Curated annotation (Swiss-Prot):
Modified sites of kind N6-(pyridoxal phosphate)lysine: 706
Function: The glycine cleavage system catalyzes the degradation of glycine. The P protein binds the alpha-amino group of glycine through its pyridoxal phosphate cofactor; CO(2) is released and the remaining methylamine moiety is then transferred to the lipoamide cofactor of the H protein.
Subunit structure, as described in the record: The glycine cleavage system is composed of four proteins: P, T, L and H.
Superkingdom as given in the UniProt entry: Bacteria
GO cellular component terms listed in the entry, alphabetical order: cytosol; glycine cleavage complex
Protein name per its UniProtKB record: Glycine dehydrogenase (decarboxylating)
Entry keyword set: Oxidoreductase, Pyridoxal phosphate
């Protein structure tokens, strides 16, 4: 009998996404004592929430069919030549950066560099980014990116509030020349904090003594280049701080903010090689004075040394961050925009100071030629000085001119019914300028002579604001200008790191799963990448279809009634969700409801976000099994009944189990007038099995960069949409270009829109059946690891059935007591085995939290378990005295190649150090540095590129 031939390709992608083969799956189930994956699911999911998920989704499509489907959607977007500007510009992504970085899984599948020894490549690139920002802004300390320019402005506002000596003030000045989307996000952030944002023309500003800070745009949104020096002095005299939103390309030619007194500079690095992407993702920047460094938001790369004294990089001053300081953190930011910051960094490396300056001069000269030509046509720019943007008083011709431009497939900025705006960029050419003259010319007018104007038009930058200081003098910006050199530099950096292209990354709570190539392909299509977020709606019908379909898919997966795709990180999704709850209570006259209950096990973003949303945090206890202590919750809910706003709870719990009492918890909160926020960080265990919107949740955020396959990018981008029940739908984030105008949490209507195709592709190829199997296999893989390792390390928490959800926590505290070996020692020793460490000391100090995801094969799971078992044997050798308690492979891990070929004085062999298991002989990862000295790095903070001599020593 011949085998039956399968004539359909539906659902074929499921087996590509899921790691274990059928035989492996059965063997793993038998290890756990189950005969089917359904039986395991039935045992793990609590009875009270079974049947809450009904995935009403079509069958999965093949990769080829899904790509054809999304290509048809993308083709509905119309790509006009765009001069809208307003913080978003066309740009050329250099091909070697596109191919070797953006499309390279060695870069886009990496995790945030909390483990510095295996992250030196992207840390170096981020240090280059920080140096770029510091140089261009004239301020000594810059962070490693924020989410977008508007949210960076909001961070600057709260930064000024913390540091201003004008402590009694609740007023923040924002220039009316700032980008409109920035002003909207400022208002959203300010309201829960009791801050009043005063928007006015700085030229009409009188007394400034009532302000704690100010935000100025440089150049202004309308194109003007203002001299802010006197204004900055006035604010400083009133004990206020000044933030400047500055265009990076313009800063190659203009006096940097730090040199005219600004305390903070913020902005976007988008025009440094990152496509428009219908609004994102793009890396924002934040730089400030050295005295303020410990109050900066976001991550900061610093220079330190390893245990051998060799230069090494690391994330510095982490005590500022939400995962440590919780509600007292400087910000709730977790995910940033590392991948996009690295693109901008390499754009600067590739072009160098001369190349960037030449681009800026070309853009400015073309703008000056355009303005002069328009002047001869009777349209004089309103700006005396400008860099790349013009405002034209077009009067009664405005509508006709706009229509004429549209007819030529050109978008102009519609300022009002009397004015049009134009912003040029590095893609603008002579022919583009001449086409604009044709549009603006009246019938019978002779067009200007481009060549003649090019020879005679002077600069329109103010002489008093021309940049005098040098930029990008460090060798890294002056070496890699040929494609060959840049390609090899990118390869050298990538080889220093561990990402998913080399190994499993078993980080608990982080869901480091497959980012399939077919999901990634549409991201770099021009139809998705080259659309301005403020283009007319009829030009973005493809995006509208994509977002409508994706919202419906996510509603089906979560059980919620409505979805907002605007938040561009999980932390921002949390914020949007709590703002929706806050607005809901206010709409009912319950403004006094401001208590947010948060379990003690919660991720640090939860209390930090509640604080940002104007809520007071009350912590509830957890019991010995890691579950929410329901009696403590009940008591505190009753105690705060009249002020209760919400509870924030993660499900499955942060401890890696499905809590049996989740419905009861939701009921207690609802009965006392509160709303239930279910943190969707662990949604990877629930899709197709149970739905938060059906078992008591009122709102959840989802991490598309976890459950739904958007890559982590080394620390961003992420997308954190929120799902809500119908009563909260009117309070989801709005935008000036949407039906609801208020409540924007980021600059663009759909946030990081250009990476939404990744999630659409994943869901479309998996279908309902595949999504359910992904959850089931994630649970199977976690329980398999738990079972294999429980004889060697105590599994700290399990459900009532002795099973975990999609992750498990190993308790290393007894090992620390018996041997002196710490969780850090085990994490660093795993590097010698070629693994990224699991999550360390969260949610319990002295533990490792392991999440394998469904994408890892049994072979890889066994390789990890074998490594952990081998490490336990080494620990036993320390315990029984066979290995020295201080000089052993764990305390000295990780071991570098340089160390192995150098003088060897350890009481264990070189072979034991670097080849503890035979499989490493054919495939060995060599860390570029030894264990990094964290204390040295914070005590001797250096956050810009060190000298070339130190690179040579490295």
């Amino acid at each position: 009998m011949t085998d039956r031939i399968e004539l359909t390709t539906a659902n074929e992608f499921i087996a590509r996404h899921i790691g274990p083969r059928a035989a492996d799956e059965q063997a793993m189930l038998q290890t756990l004592g189950f005969d089917s994956i359904e039986a395991l699911s039935e045992s793990v999911i609590p009875e009270s929430i079974k049947g809450t998920s009904v995935l009403n989704l079509p069958a999965g499509q093949s990769e080829a069919d899904a790509l054809a489907s999304i290509k048809a959607i993308a083709s509905k977007n119309q790509l006009f030549k765009t001069y809208i500007g307003q913080g978003y510009y066309n740009t050329h992504t250099p091909a070697p950066i596109l191919r070797n970085l953006l499309e390279n899984p060695a870069w886009y599948t990496a995790y945030t560099p909390y483990q510095p020894e295996i992250s030196q490549g992207r840390l170096e690139s981020l240090l280059n980014f920080q140096t770029l920002i510091s140089d261009l802004t004239g301020l000594p300390i810059a962070n490693a990116s924020l989410l977008d320019e508007a949210t960076a402005a909001a961070e600057a506002m709260t930064f000024c509030k913390r540091l201003s000596k004008n402590k009694g003030s609740q007023q923040f000045f924002a220039s009316s020349h700032c980008h409109p989307q920035t002003l909207d996000v400022l208002r959203t952030r300010a309201e829960p904090l009791g801050i009043t944002v005063v928007v006015a023309d700085e030229a009409e500003l009188g007394d400034v003594s009532d302000y704690f800070g100010a935000l100025l745009q440089y150049p202004a949104s309308n194109g003007d280049v203002f001299d802010y020096r006197e204004l900055v002095e006035r604010f400083h005299a009133a004990n206020a701080l000044v933030a400047v939103a500055a265009d990076l390309l313009a800063l190659t030619l203009l006096t940097p903010p730090g040199e005219f007194g600004a305390d903070v500079a913020i902005g976007s690095a988008q025009r440094f090689g990152v496509p428009l992407g219908f609004g994102g993702p793009h890396a924002a920047y934040f730089s400030t004075r050295d005295a303020f460094k410990r109050d900066m938001p976001g991550r900061l790369v610093g220079v330190s040394v390893d245990r051998h004294g060799k230069q090494a990089l690391r994330l510095a001053m982490q005590t500022r961050e939400q995962h440590i300081r919780r509600e007292k953190a400087t910000s709730n930011i977790c995910t940033a925009q590392v991948l996009l910051a690295n693109i901008a960094s390499m754009y600067a490396v590739y072009h160098g100071p001369r190349g960037l300056t030449q681009i800026a001069k070309r853009v400015h000269q073309l703008t000056a030629i355009l303005a002069e030509g328009l002047s001869t046509l009777g349209l004089k720019a309103e700006q005396a000085f400008f860099f790349d943007s013009l405002t034209l008083n077009t009067g009664s011709r405005t509508a006709a001119l706009h229509a004429a431009a549209r007819a030529r497939h050109i978008n102009l900025r519609e300022i009002d019914d009397q004015h049009l705006g134009l912003s040029l960029d590095e893609t603008t050419s002579q022919s583009a300028v001449e086409t604009l003259w044709e549009i603006f010319a009246s019938d019978g007018q002779n067009l200007p002579d481009f060549t003649a104007l090019a020879a005679s038009v002077p600069s329109r930058l103010p002489a008093t604001l021309l940049r005098q200081s040098a930029i990008l003098s460090h060798p890294v910006f002056n070496r890699y200008h040929s494609e060959t050199e840049l390609m090899r530099y990118l390869r050298k950096l990538a080889d220093k790191d561990l990402a998913l292209d080399r190994t499993m990354i078993p980080l608990g709570s982080c869901t480091m799963k497959l980012n399939a190539a077919s999901e990634m392909i549409p991201v770099t299509w021009a139809e998705f990448g080259n659309l301005h977020p403020f283009a007319p709606a009829e030009q973005s019908t493809g995006y509208q279809q994509l977002t409508d379909e994706l919202e419906a898919m996510l509603c089906a997966a979560t059980g919620y009634d409505a979805i907002s795709l605007q938040p561009n990180a999980g932390s921002q999704g949390e914020y949007a969700g709590l703002l929706a709850i806050r607005a809901y209570h206010q709409s009912r006259g319950d403004e006094h409801r401001d208590i947010c209950l948060i379990p003690s096990s919660a991720h640090g973003t939860n209390p930090a976000t509640a604080n940002m949303a104007g809520m007071r945090v009350v912590v509830t206890a957890c019991d010995a099994r890691g579950n929410v202590d329901i009696e403590d919750l009940r008591a505190k809910t009753v105690q705060h009944r009249d002020q209760l706003a919400a509870i924030m709870i993660t499900y499955p719990s942060t401890h890696g189990v499905f809590e049996e009492g989740i419905r009861e918890i939701c009921g207690i909160v609802h009965d006392n007038g509160g709303q239930v926020y279910i943190d969707g960080a662990n949604m990877n265990a629930m899709v197709g099995l149970c739905a938060p919107g059906k078992f008591g949740g009122d709102v959840s955020h989802l991490n598309l960069h976890k459950t739904f396959c958007i890559p982590h990018g080394g620390g961003g981008p992420g997308v954190g949409p929120i799902g809500v029940k119908s009563h909260l739908a009117p309070f989801m984030p709005g935008h000036a270009r949407m039906e609801r105008k208020e409540g924007a949490v980021c600059a663009a209507p759909f946030g990081s829109a250009s990476i939404l195709p990744i999630t659409w592709m994943y869901i479309r190829m998996m279908g309902g059946e595949g999504l359910k199997r992904a959850s089931q296999l994630a649970i199977l893989n976690a329980n398999y690891i738990s079972r294999r390792l429980e004889e060697h390390y105590p599994v700290l928490y399990t459900g009532t059935n002795g099973l975990v959800a999609h992750e498990c926590i190993l308790d290393l505290r007894p090992i620390k007591d018996s041997s002196g070996i710490s969780v850090d020692d085990v994490a660093k020793r795993l590097i010698d085995f070629g693994f990224h460490a699991p999550t360390m000391s969260f949610p319990v100090a002295g533990t490792l939290m392991i999440e394998p995801t469904e994408s890892e094969s049994r072979e890889e799971l066994d390789r990890f378990c074998d490594a952990m078992i081998k490490i336990r044997e080494e620990i036993r050798a320390v315990e029984n005295g066979t290995l020295d308690k201080d000089d052993n492979p764990l305390k000295n891990a990780p071991h570098t190649a340089a160390e192995i070929v150098g003088q060897w004085s350890h009481p264990y062999s070189r072979e034991q150090a670097v080849y503890p298991v035979d499989s490493l002989i054919e495939n060995k990862y060599w860390p570029p540095v030894g264990r990094v000295d964290n204390v040295f790095g914070d005590r001797n903070l250096v956050c810009a590129c060190p000298s070339i001599e130190s690179y040579q020593e490295a």
